[in-house]
Structure formats: C-alpha cells, structure tokens
Curated annotation (Swiss-Prot):
This is Malate dehydrogenase. Signal peptide: none annotated. InterPro entries: L-lactate/malate_DH (IPR001557), Lactate/malate_DH_C (IPR022383), Lactate/malate_DH_N (IPR001236), Lactate_DH/Glyco_Ohase_4_C (IPR015955), Malate_DH_type3 (IPR011275), NAD(P)-bd_dom_sf (IPR036291). Substrate binds at R83, R89, N121, R152. It comes from the Bacteria. CDD domains: LDH-like_MDH. SUPFAM superfamilies: LDH C-terminal domain-like, NAD(P)-binding Rossmann-fold domains. One of its GO terms (molecular function) is L-malate dehydrogenase (NAD+) activity. Catalyzes the reversible oxidation of malate to oxaloacetate. Keywords: NAD, Oxidoreductase, Tricarboxylic acid cycle. The active site is at H176. NCBIfam families: MalateDH_bact, PRK06223.1.
C-alpha cells in the first residue's frame, strides 16, 4: 500500500514543524514547497536525518515548483507573511491574498483531489479566498483556527484547575481574531461544567473571564514575546490533528473554519464551528444552541469576517 502524500505550502517555522510532526506520526511522505530556494530542501533533509534516531519511515522532498505537490492527499498551506508585534492578523490581508491566489492555482492544477488545510492569516478570509481560487469543493477546504484557539483555552483552564489537559474539554467558535467566541458554557473538566466548578469554589467567574480574554489574545501574547514572528508549535500540532482525522477517517469532532450554507444563519462564508472531519473532509457541521449573549458575540465575529471578505473582493474582484 502506497504511503499518503502530504504537501506543505510554505516551509517556514510552521511548515518545518508540520513536516517533523507528520514524520513522527508516520502520516505519509512529505513534500515541502517554498519560493525560497534551499529552504525546503534543507529542512526536508534535516528532518529525514532525524528519522533513524526517532524511528520513523517517510520520504521528505524539498521543492520550489508546484509540480512537486502533484497527487497530494493533503495540502497544508502556511505560505504568507506572519504577524509582527503591533500587527493584527487583519493587517496581513493584501499581501497574503496575492499569495493565496498563487497557491490556489497550484493546488487546482496539481492536487485537485486533496484535503486542504489553510493556516495563513487572516485565517477566515484567506481560506474563503483559497477555496474560490482553487475551485475545490468547500467540504475539502478548511481553515485551522478553532483547534488551536480551543487548545489554548484548554491549556489555560488546566493551569487554573491544576488538572491534566486531557480532562479539559473546551472549544471556540467564530473567526480567528479578537472577536472569537470561547464558549465557557460548553466547556468541562471531566464532564463537570465550568459553572459547577465556580460553585464548588475551584475558581471564580472573574478568573474565567480573564482566561477567556487571554484565549482571545493568545496569538498576540506569543507574538509579543517572540518579537520576530508568531506561534508555530501549537498551530502545527493543531493542523496535524485535522490532517490525521482525515487520513485515518477518525471522524474527530473538531472546531474548524468551514464554509457554512445556512447553519448559524450564515451562508457562503468560512467561520469557526464544530465539525466532524473524516475521509470525505467536512462530513458534518454541528449546529449547537447559542444563548442570547453567545449569539450576539458570534454574530459580531461573523460581521468581522464578512468585512474582511469584502476587503478581499475590493482587491481581487474575481472573488465576487
């Protein structure tokens, strides 16, 4: 049986980490693509040389030509400019939209059957544009945001309660930006709702509110600390979890940026929602009940994403 083929568009910090994780998990052979000559080749060789130590079998190929991604089963897109201190994800719009146009053309030509995961910011607008540029069906093109934002939320909660991250369930809806919606009401520790933990004296509502805000600011916190780039370990791990669920037909329930067709009152836009990811891509979109405040927050987040999509159309009218 032939190995799966995983193509990584962009060989920066996230791309290199993706390649390493794909190797460690033996998800398939990896192609690293980048416009910078030598970078994907060097990283691919370096990771390949770690395989005898870590005991995994996979082929790593570096390339500067889209032809190398031909026939890929999964394509993960990280290409574009990362955030720097003081920048919002939205500041990257004009630059990264042009990148998505080139990437979309490459995927359309060489990997039209692939499951595509976009990580490039501003995430929700970029995955929306990438789907249009590539022409791939919407259920095969998703954005990585909710898994990462939820992981941050889960980690902060585990620290607050001094429990294993494995026992914390939490997820985040909406756009991947300052208006994201961490849902405390649907978050639990070993099945115990956060509201009950407040009553039990494990934490306070004020502390939970601060954790929710820290989750929203999670990416900016790391950008501020690194000063020269943005997060890459957690984003890469999140995308690999999505790719693994697709490749192994695990049918994981994961929050991803998916195209909505009426769910949550939204049409033809990519927004973070809980989904089932299996061998057919997005196999189901889970529409949960939101209370009045949650719905207002979600609608605000959707409006923010809609504004970014309109800005994209202003730059590239063909997206309309």
């Amino acid at each position: 049986m032939a190995r799966n083929k995983i193509a990584l568009i962009g060989s920066g910090m996230i791309g290199g980490t993706l390649a390493h994780l794909a190797g460690l998990k033996e998800l398939g052979d990896v192609v690293l693509f980048d416009i910078a000559e030598g970078t994907p080749q060097g990283k691919g060789l370096d990771i390949a040389e770690s395989s005898p130590v870590d005991g995994f079998d996979a082929k790593f190929t570096g390339a500067n030509d889209y032809a190398a991604i031909e026939g890929a089963d999964v394509v993960i897109v990280t290409a574009g400019v990362p955030r720097k201190p003081g920048m919002s994800r939205d500041d990257l719009l004009g630059i990264n939209l042009k990148v998505m146009e080139q990437v979309g053309a490459g995927i359309k030509k060489y990997a039209p059957e692939a499951f595509v995961i976009c990580i490039t910011n501003p995430l929700d607008a970029m995955v929306w544009a990438l789907q249009k540029f590539s022409g791939l069906p919407a259920h095969k093109v998703v954005g990585m945001a909710g898994v990462l934002d939820s992981a941050r939320f889960r980690y902060f909660l585990s620290e607050e309660f001094n429990v294993s991250v494995e026992d914390v369930t939490a997820f985040v809806l909406g756009g991947h930006g300052d208006s994201m919606v961490p849902l405390a009401r649907y978050s639990t520790v070993a099945g115990i709702p956060l509201s009950d933990l407040v009553k039990m004296g494990w934490t306070s509502q004020d502390k939970l509110d601060k954790i929710i805000q820290r989750t929203r600011d999670g990416g900016a916190e790391i950008v501020g600390l690194l000063k020269t780039g943005s997060a890459f370990y957690a984003p890469a791990a999140s995308a690999i979890q999505m790719a693994e669920s697709y490749l192994k037909d695990k049918k994981r329930v994961l929050p991803v940026a998916a195209q909505l067709s009426g769910q949550y009152g939204v049409k033809d836009m990519y927004v973070g929602v809980p989904t089932v990811i299996g061998a057919n891509g997005v196999e189901r979109i889970i529409e949960i009940d939101l209370d009045k405040d949650e719905k207002a927050q979600f609608d605000k987040s959707v409006a923010s994403v809609a504004g970014l999509c309109e800005a994209c159309i202003g730059i590239a009218p063909s997206l309309k």
